[in-house]
Amino acid sequence: MKSRREQDYYLGLDIGTESVGYAVTDENYNILKFNGKNMWGSRLFDEAQTAAERRTFRSGRRRLQRRAWRIQLLQELFSEEISKVDQSFFVKMKESPLILTDKTNGQKYTLFNDDDYSDIDYYSEFPTIYHLRKALLVEDRKFDVRLLYLAVHHIVKHRGHFLFQGSVNNATSFHSVFDNLKICLRDEFEIELECHSEEKIAEILKDKKKSKRDKCNEIFNELNTDKSNKQIKSIVTLISGMKAKVADIFADESLLEIDKPSISFSESSYETLRVELEDVLGERCGVIDIIKCVYDWAILADILADGEINGKSYLSVAKVNLYDKHKEDLRILKQLFKGNHKVYKEFFVDEGKSNYCAYVGFVNSNGSKKNIKRCNREDFIKNLKNQLGKIEKTVSNQSEYEFIEQEIQADTILPVQISKDNGVIPYQVQGMELKDILAKAEKYMPFLSVKDSDGVSVSDKIVKIFEFRVPYYVGPLNGYNNTNSWMVRKSDGKITPWNFDNKVDKDASAEKFIRKMTNKCTYLVGEDVLPKHALLYEEFNVLNELNNIKIGANKLDADLKKDIINNLFKKKKKVTGKNLREYLKCEGLINDDEEITGFDINFKSSMSSYLDFKKILGDKIDNYSVKMMVEQIILWITVYGDEISILKRVIRKQYDDNQISNEEIKKISRLKYQGWGRLSRKFLGEIEGADKETGEIRTIIG
């Protein structure tokens, strides 16, 4: 007989994400004791976190470090000239956030402390930085080098987004964003978006006098589409700034159950919602981004609408006009409110949650400005409407009251310099202004035209600093921490935006990036995973879905799955359940009464990359050698991203004109693929085994 210490027992575990519960029992499930205490309990701990949060902080830290690096390089270019005028200028700028007692120079003013020019004069002449930028553009006089630096510093610090490639005309072109939308809808949903006039749609979107609903209806009428098409209607609704259901946009009823089933680009919370959407939609979120580009174009067109000088639209000119409009709107509003002292004080003077002070972010306290927490525009407008309701009966100037109401209705009242709308400004708009400011300044500041031993002028270096982005496949430029650095150098020395191509071997760095950053196969140790859009990996995902399908109680056989792939997935980017049923009926494999089970309404997988390359290469994509070439090109597209010049170069270096033409390379360079799978080529296509029933030698993918 076993002693009590040797008897059999059960150990039960309840393992969760934040706790582990345990219990020890005998064979009859009675809790056992040890040292007089029941052997059960739990251990609590913090839930494990993925690397995503760390990566977000690291990316943000690097972004700020690179911004500081750009500013440092800019200061080095200006330092000699500025030191001739004010040797402590950069020190004063650095210490500007400090109180007077903490400053090393003990000066009251933060920028200018000359005998004949101080900060008071500066802010009187240039109420905002955009007033200074505009003056440098349009006024024919010599400016202090410090003023030039302040304007250039602002542009270099706030460059704009890099979503569009090419010239400023391409970045601000409606045709460009609308064409991208048409391509996206054709590829993702097989929707041919045709319209009577692109120019008319652009004019509708830009019209400030039209309501969002009117814009939506008029744009929809301009499209050559079925008026009952719910999907197109929801996309147009979104473009117009109204709220649309995600399920309608994707024609996917399963999306009705998500936490936030409706979205609107005009809401201040959209950017937060975008992160949540990506978790649900995955790569399909790219469709939302392309739709938003059309919406963003309308905002950009509105921002630049009043900024035209000599055929060019300048941001600074537009922003100065916004400042003037805000000033005039504020004057009218204060005039309306003056008849009611209490309401006036609550809205314009006191520190509140959604009054004017909260809207602009400061309140006048004891003769000085005090920064306070800002409210969003939606809350401010809501409060403004309420306050106007209180004074409606006491207003003496009815025309001004009606003007304010119209401005509120059009959402153009009291525009501010800093808002979320600034996020739609592409770097090309800022870059054009920077180049024109420098070109004008070169006439009276000769140091800007001085060239170094490589023939690069100071102005050219400033533009290079502004346009420079470290390619993600090059990684950190500081090789101090070798575990997170893989850059390959061509030569030693300090790396700057204007010598980057001479100091860094981008091709070798990209190859090293592939080897370092590519994940490894889930099942085979040391084998690199395939790109998410590799031909083989997409075919595997399609087969994975087909393997679950049943006609009645029977699964599809191998030959039928192959036929479905050849006749449906290799012809359509989006295969639906309806497409499958129609195909099986045409082949005489099912009748109207038989049920198809094992998948959702539509297939989630597709062979999109096969179809992309078939459009470019034709039927030769089915040749084995061409297919292997395509697989390699897909890998390069995934790695190099937007670096089109490198992509073209590596393709041409590897394959000659007989294998792929320059025109084909040009078309291929427009393709965009992102993401990686979890399985390797060796696992899917090279490991062989014998079928137990037939003895046939096969791979995992067949």
Question: Where are each of the predicted segments found?
Answer:
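Extended, Lys/Arg-rich, non-catalytic nucleic-acid recognition/anchoring regions
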Residues: 1-702
